[in-house]
Amino acid sequence: GASFSLKNNCNLPLIINGSKKLKSIRFFENKGSAQCKSSVMFAGMRADGKTIIRAKKSRNHTELLCKHLKLPISIKKKKNYDEIKIKKVENIKTLNYNIPSDISSSAFFIVLTVLSKNSRR
């Protein structure tokens, strides 16, 4: 869970505050939705324990980003799905990114930034 709010008379920036205590889950994603899979991955980074995701094949941008940032993620490729395991992340190295295109392409980076300890809010 998270709470969302806006600053100064309902203007941007959007403020997202995560729950203090999340529990890890086992999640079965069978629609091939990279957005659903990524959402659970990001939540798993804040959850106690190990979050396990069994996901139908879909875009792997979030997985590649997690590996690039050396986050505690493991991916096993199966015939019809991927099994992703992710542990709680205490710190995410902050980086500057230039993200072209539409907002949906940058949504994952926005969430990752919000989860980062040194992000400006």
Stretch-by-stretch model annotation:
Residues 1-121:
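Structural preference for solvent-exposed beta-strand-turn elements
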